[in-house]
C-alpha cells in the first residue's frame, strides 16, 4: 500500500526548512510579521519601566568627589597664599580642581555659601578700605585647624563650635555690705524758743558784775515794774499763758533788770520773785 494514501487521514506536518529552527512567535505580535531585533544581545537586562503611581529613581551621579562641602571649602582655604579667599575665588578653585562641579548645574554654589555662613569654623574677614575688590574674605578659624584627621579631608573629627565669650558680671548693688538701707539722718533739733516756762524756772542769778548804766526811767530801785518798760515794749502773746490764766511773759530787758537788782526783790532769786508776782492766779504752785 502506498504510504501517502495510508496517512491521508492525519493533518499535514509543518515542513522544516534547511535554514534552521524558526523563532517562536511573541505574544501580541501580528501573524506574518517578523519580531523586532533585540539590541545589545541577550546579556543586557531590560530597563525597568515604573508602574503607575511610582517615582523613577534618580541615576547615581558618577564622578562626584567624595568630599563634603566643608572639606571643599577648607581645601580651597588651605591652598590659598594668605589662607583666605573670597567667595568667587572659592568657586573658581573648586571648578578648576574638580570637573564634576564645572559641568554640573550651579546648585552646589548655594550649598557652598550656606556652609560658609552656618559653620563656626569659617570666619568672615572684612576687606581693607585700601584694598579694591568686591566681597569679603573667608578664612579658617585657627582653633579648627585639627578638624580633619591627619590632614585628610575625607574624615572630619567633630563639629567645630566657637566658644562663646562669658557675659559681663552684673553691676554690684549700691550697698553691698548693708542688707538694709542706711538709717535716715536724725532731724535737727528745733531751735529753742526765747522764753519757756521751764527755762524761766531754772534761771539762776548770775554773779554781780559790771552793770551797764540804766536809763533814767529804770533807775528807781524800788519799782518792780517800771512804767517805761511797760510802755516801751508791747506785750507778747503767749497761748500757754492765756490757757493757764497767766499774764504774758515780760520782755528780756525788764527781766535782766530785775535779775540785776536782787536787793530790791529781797532774799529770793529772780525766779522766785517772778513766781511771787501779784498778777499770778492762786494755786499755781501745783503746776510747777
Curated annotation (Swiss-Prot):
Lineage summary: Eukaryota, Metazoa, Chordata, Craniata, Vertebrata
Q: Which organism is it from?
A: Mus musculus
DNA-binding segment(s) = 64-158
Segments carrying the region annotation (Disordered) are 1-62, 163-189
Task: State the function annotated in the UniProt record.
Answer: Transcription factor that controls lens epithelial cell growth through regulation of proliferation, apoptosis and cell cycle. During lens development, controls the ratio of the lens fiber cells to the cells of the anterior lens epithelium by regulating the rate of proliferation and differentiation. Controls lens vesicle closure and subsequent separation of the lens vesicle from ectoderm. Is required for morphogenesis and differentiation of the anterior segment of the eye. Controls the expression of DNAJB1 in a pathway that is crucial for the development of the anterior segment of the eye.
Q: Where in the cell is it found?
A: Nucleus
Gene that produces this protein: Foxe3
Cellular component terms (Gene Ontology): nucleus; transcription regulator complex
What coarse category fits the chief subcellular location reported for this protein?
nucleus
Which portions of the chain have biased composition (kind: Pro residues)?
166-189
Q: Which cysteines are joined by disulfide bonds?
A: none
Stated name of the protein: Forkhead box protein E3
For the biological process aspect of GO, one term held by this record is:
regulation of cell cycle
What would changing residue 93 to L do, according to UniProt?
Answer: In dyl; negative regulation of lens epithelial cell proliferation; positive regulation of lens fiber cell differentiation; positive regulation of epithelial cell apoptotic process; loss of sequence-specific DNA binding
Q: Name one Pfam family in it.
A: Forkhead
GO MF annotation, one? DNA-binding transcription factor activity
Amino acid at each position: 500500500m502506498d504510504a501517502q494514501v495510508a496517512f491521508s487521514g492525519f493533518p499535514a506536518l509543518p515542513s522544516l526548512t534547511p535554514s534552521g529552527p524558526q523563532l517562536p512567535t511573541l505574544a501580541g505580535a501580528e501573524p506574518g510579521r517578523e519580531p523586532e531585533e533585540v539590541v545589545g544581545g541577550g546579556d543586557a537586562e531590560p530597563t525597568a519601566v515604573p508602574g503607575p503611581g511610582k517615582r523613577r529613581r534618580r541615576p547615581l551621579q558618577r564622578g562626584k568627589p567624595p568630599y563634603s562641602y566643608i572639606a571643599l571649602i577648607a581645601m580651597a582655604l588651605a591652598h590659598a597664599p594668605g589662607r583666605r579667599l573670597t567667595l568667587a575665588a572659592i568657586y573658581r578653585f573648586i571648578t578648576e580642581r574638580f570637573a564634576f562641579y564645572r559641568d554640573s548645574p550651579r546648585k552646589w554654589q548655594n550649598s557652598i555659601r550656606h556652609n560658609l555662613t552656618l559653620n563656626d569654623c569659617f570666619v568672615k574677614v572684612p576687606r581693607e578700605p585700601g584694598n579694591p575688590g568686591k566681597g569679603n574674605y573667608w578664612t579658617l578659624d585657627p582653633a579648627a585647624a585639627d578638624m580633619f584627621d591627619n590632614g585628610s579631608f575625607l574624615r572630619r573629627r567633630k563639629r567645630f563650635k566657637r566658644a562663646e565669650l562669658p557675659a559681663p558680671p552684673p553691676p554690684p548693688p549700691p550697698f553691698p555690705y548693708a542688707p538694709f538701707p542706711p538709717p535716715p539722718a536724725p532731724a535737727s533739733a528745733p531751735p529753742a524758743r526765747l522764753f519757756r516756762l521751764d527755762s524761766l524756772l531754772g534761771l539762776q542769778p548770775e554773779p554781780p558784775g559790771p552793770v551797764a548804766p540804766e536809763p533814767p526811767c529804770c533807775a528807781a530801785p524800788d519799782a518792780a515794774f517800771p512804767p517805761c518798760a511797760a510802755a516801751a515794749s508791747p506785750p507778747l502773746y503767749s497761748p500757754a499763758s492765756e490757757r493757764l490764766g497767766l499774764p504774758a511773759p515780760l520782755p528780756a530787758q525788764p527781766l535782766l533788770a530785775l535779775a540785776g537788782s536782787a536787793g530790791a526783790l529781797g532774799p529770793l532769786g529772780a525766779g522766785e520773785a517772778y513766781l511771787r508776782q501779784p498778777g499770778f492766779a492762786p494755786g499755781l504752785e501745783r503746776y510747777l
